[in-house]
Design a protein with these regions (language model features):
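General structural feature for long, well-ordered alpha-helical segments within catalytic domains
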Residues: 2, 13-20, 33, 37-41, ...
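Metal-dependent amide/peptide-bond hydrolase catalytic core
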Residues: 226-426
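Histidine/acidic-residue-rich, glycine-tolerant segments that coordinate divalent metal ions
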Residues: 83-85, 94-111, 117-118, 129-252, ...
Length: 426
């Protein structure tokens, strides 16, 4: 039986998975606090006879292993965490949740503003489809639900917790690792590309030190707010004046914090910086420029001591394996036709997904197996058409208004994941 026939025969009714999606969307969990998503994923996998489910890997991470003969192993990955965003979609199942973030102890609004709830529901439906289609494929299927993607810690944590240690979690090393992400493109579409597909990302918390005092006596202080302001403005020149225009890079200061009230000059300021780059050379150059600028501005301002640098996250480059991606693209083209784009432009965002492949043991005795990552659209086709024709705004990932239309988004995501799995297991 060919793959399109397997899809039409074995794909389950998606209504229960739509309900799962709505429940997860209404009750999200911040990074490191994805308890409902993990519970839901484990319950779904355990409902399918034959899956060996292992939980609490690197936090709330879990896997389901289905052995079905053969000698090939593939790993399918979905992420589970939400974001500190106050939802403004107006959906009947919108999140109203607030919770204390275990990272900093601050209470925050929580929203699935990046679609990871869709990833969980879609993966569970794909798992059921593949379970029903067991007679049509051979090999070992590993379904992995990963926490803490947004802060780039989940994949590393699962690896550090012995994900591929057979004696600990019984997870065999995969021959190929596959993953997908819902994005702000037309629902029903799928896209990927060979090679560079997502940028590297580096985030820092930088503390600069002045000398606090009374607001009426600035001459007796060293104002860290002014110091931070000079740093922020100067950082904007890195991309415009130091990066080759043929390259791509982004330097964003997403948070600045100093002082408690207007009549006191603070003693220090904290700047949170996020950097995106698409080549190792540019990454090295931009990070060096940031350090140079911060150090120089602190010295020029008379800082009382050297700035404190703290790395808060680091995402690798996502470089899709050529052979794997070309093989999968052929299969996607056969199923999705002109709704599939094999030359999708590089994503501005970043992923820790590749770590699950680059840290996997391979048959040569080293580390690193092939991987492919792709996207599927979540925007209502009519809204997409209106945006193309009239320029109306479409909320993007991480927006308080980001709300994938449930169908055909979910059906497309299920089909894509099943097609990918069967392509390497048939």
């Amino acid at each position: 039986m060919d793959i399109p026939s397997i899809l039409s025969t074995c794909k389950p009714d998606l209504a229960p998975y739509e309900s799962i999606y709505k429940d997860l969307h209404k009750h999200p969990g911040l990074s490191l606090q994805e308890y409902l998503a993990a519970e839901t994923a484990a319950k779904g996998l355990r409902s399918l006879p034959g899956f060996d489910v292992r939980t609490n890997i690197g936090g709330t991470g879990l896997i389901g292993i289905l052995k079905n003969g053969g000698d090939k192993t593939i790993l399918l990955r979905a992420d589970t965490d939400a974001l500190p965003v106050e939802e403004l979609t107006g959906l009947e199942y919108a999140s109203k949740k607030r919770e204390v973030d275990v990272e900093d102890g601050i209470e925050k609004p929580v929203m699935h503003a990046c679609g990871h709830d869709m990833h969980v529901a879609t993966m569970l439906a794909a798992a059921e489809t593949l379970h029903k289609a067991k007679e049509h494929w051979k090999g070992t299927l590993v379904i992995l639900f990963q926490p803490n993607e947004e802060r780039a810690g989940g994949a590393k944590a699962m690896i550090s917790d012995g994900l591929y240690d057979l004696s600990k979690h019984a997870c065999p090393a995969p021959d190929v690792v596959l993953g997908q992400h819902v994005m702000w493109f037309e629902a029903g579409t799928v896209g990927t590309r060979v090679g560079s597909f997502a940028s590297a990302a580096d985030s820092f918390r930088v503390t600069v030190y002045g000398r606090g005092g009374h607001a009426s006596q600035p001459h007796r202080t060293v104002d860290p707010v002014v110091m931070a302001a000079h740093i922020i403005v100067r950082l904007q020149t890195i991309v415009s004046r130091e990066v080759d225009p043929r390259e791509a890079a982004v330097v964003t200061v997403g948070s600045v914090q100093a002082g408690m009230t207007e009549n006191i000059i603070a003693g220090e300021a904290v700047i949170k910086i996020n950097v995106r780059t698409v080549t190792p050379e540019t990454r090295t150059k931009v990070l060096a420029a940031i350090q140079r600028i911060v150090k120089a501005e602190c010295e020029a301002s008379g800082a009382t001591k050297e700035p404190l640098w703290e790395s808060t996250s680091s995402f690798p480059f996502t470089n899709n394996d050529k052979k794997t991606t070309e093989t999968l693209s052929e299969a996607f083209l056969n199923v999705f036709g002109d709704k599939f784009d094999p030359e999708t432009g590089p994503l501005g965002g970043s992923e820790d997904f590749p770590i699950l492949a680059t840290e996997a043991p391979n048959k040569s005795g080293g580390k690193g197996v092939p991987y492919c990552y792709w996207i599927f659209g979540g925007v209502d086709p009519e809204k997409w058409k209106d945006s193309v024709e009239n320029g109306t705004d479409i909320p993007i990932n991480h927006s308080a208004y980001f709300a994938p239309v449930i169908q055909p988004t979910m059906a497309t995501g299920v089909d894509a994941m099943v097609v990918a799995a069967l392509t390497f297991l048939k």
